[in-house]
Design a protein with these regions (language model features):
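Active-site-adjacent beta->alpha loops and helix N-cap segments on the catalytic face
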Residues: 2, 31, 62-65, 89-93, ...
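Hydrophobic faces of well-ordered beta-strands that scaffold small-molecule active sites
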Residues: 19-21, 49-51, 107-110, 126-130, ...
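N-terminal amphipathic alpha-helix/helix-capping segment at the start of soluble metabolic enzymes
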Residues: 1-20
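Catalytic domains of carbohydrate-active enzymes, especially glycoside hydrolases
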Residues: 36-55, 123-124
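Glycine-enriched alpha-helix->loop->beta-strand junction motifs that scaffold or abut catalytic
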Residues: 45, 119-128, 146-151
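Active-site beta->alpha loop and helix N-cap motifs at the rims of alpha/beta catalytic domains
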Residues: 71-138
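Conserved, mostly hydrophobic/aromatic
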Residues: 22, 41, 120, 154
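Glycine-rich, proline-tolerant flexible connector loops at the mouths of alpha/beta enzymes
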Residues: 47-87
Length: 166
C-alpha cells in the first residue's frame, strides 16, 4: 500500500481523501484575505491550503513582463507589475505559516520555477505541489525532489508516459 505523510497526516490508498483548498492568487495580494481564506477552508474541512509561488522575472520574457496590462482587474500598469502585486514574500509566507499552524491546517505551495522552489524549501514547507504544466519539466522536478519532501503532481493534459516519467 502506498503512503505519504504531509503535515503529520497520513495519506494512503485505502484512507480518507486529503482535501487541498487551492487559494492560488485569489487573495489578490492581501494578507488578511489569504488568512480569511485559510480559515474558511479549514472550517469547510480542508486538510491543507495551497498558494502559488512564482519568480515572475524568471518565468516571463522581458517583453512579456513589461507589456502594458490594461485590464479592469489589473494590479499594475504592466503584466509584470500585476503579477508582482499578487506575490507574497518571506515575511508574508512566515506569517501565513504561523497562522496555518495556529488554526490547524497544513500550508504549502506550488513552485513554478527553481528560485521559487528554493524559497519554499528555505521556509521548510511540508510538501511541494507541481503544476500540470510542469509535469514534463524534469529539471524542475529533479530539483524539487532533492529537498526530500512529498511532491503532489497535477497530471491534467499529461499522458501516462508523462506521469510515469515524472
Amino acid at each position: 500500500m502506498r503512503k505519504l505523510t504531509i503535515g503529520g497526516k497520513v495519506i494512503q490508498d485505502d484512507g480518507n481523501c486529503y482535501v487541498i483548498a487551492e487559494i492560488g492568487h485569489n487573495h489578490q495580494g492581501k494578507l488578511e484575505t489569504a488568512k480569511e481564506m485559510f480559515k474558511v477552508a479549514k472550517e469547510c474541512g480542508a486538510d491543507a491550503v495551497k498558494l502559488q509561488k512564482r519568480n515572475n522575472r524568471e518565468l516571463f520574457t522581458k517583453a512579456g513582463y513589461e507589456k502594458p496590462y490594461d485590464n479592469p482587474n489589473s494590479y499594475g500598469e504592466t503584466y509584470g507589475e500585476h503579477r508582482e502585486f499578487l506575490e507574497f514574500g518571506g515575511i508574508e509566507y512566515k506569517e501565513l505559516m504561523d497562522y496555518a499552524d495556529e488554526i490547524g491546517v497544513t500550508f504549502f505551495s506550488t513552485a513554478f520555477d527553481f528560485s521559487s522552489a528554493d524559497f519554499l524549501a528555505k521556509l521548510d514547507m511540508p510538501a511541494f505541489k507541481i503544476a500540470s504544466g510542469d509535469l514534463k519539466n524534469i529539471p524542475l522536478l529533479t530539483h524539487i525532489a532533492e529537498f526530500q519532501k512529498p511532491m503532489i503532481l497535477s497530471t491534467g493534459g499529461g499522458t501516462m508516459e508523462d506521469v510515469n516519467r515524472a
